[in-house]
């Protein structure tokens, strides 16, 4: 028996959209994807484009997930991490960061420590 994990994206920019599109193209179910961002109008566009669940509440988004993809700009990462830290410390999802220039040890500290954490550097064609 294999079930798809629920993956939440904190951040809904170009890179998150590209990853979501690729996941859906490869057969991942939209019902297992959550996306959060501060701009509800942009989120509604993402919902219409991909059929995923959306929210402006980062904590709620993180709470839904088996895996959380941190897809925000490096300059807001500390704030986002401290906001969701109480939730992810409780639920213990796999944390994945696609932000450039931030060390895993820094992310680990901001998230409260001890979570499974992966840094990746995705690249999309120009």
Stretches found by the model and what they are:
Residues 1-56, 60-63:
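NAD(P)+-binding Rossmann beta1-loop-alpha1 motif at the extreme N-terminus of oxidoreductases
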């Amino acid at each position: 028996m294999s079930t798809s994990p629920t993956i939440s994206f904190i951040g809904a920019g170009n890179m998150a959209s590209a990853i979501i599109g690729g996941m859906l193209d490869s057969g991942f179910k939209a019902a297992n994807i959550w996306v959060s961002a501060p701009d509800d109008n942009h989120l509604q566009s993402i919902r219409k484009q991909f059929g995923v669940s959306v929210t402006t509440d980062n904590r709620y988004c993180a709470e839904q997930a088996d895996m959380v993809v941190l897809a925000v700009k490096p300059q807001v990462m500390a704030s986002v991490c401290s906001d969701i830290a109480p939730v992810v410390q409780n639920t213990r999802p796999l944390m994945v960061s696609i932000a450039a220039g931030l060390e895993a040890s820094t992310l680990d500290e901001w998230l409260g420590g001890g979570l499974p954490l992966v840094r990746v550097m995705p690249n999309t064609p120009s």
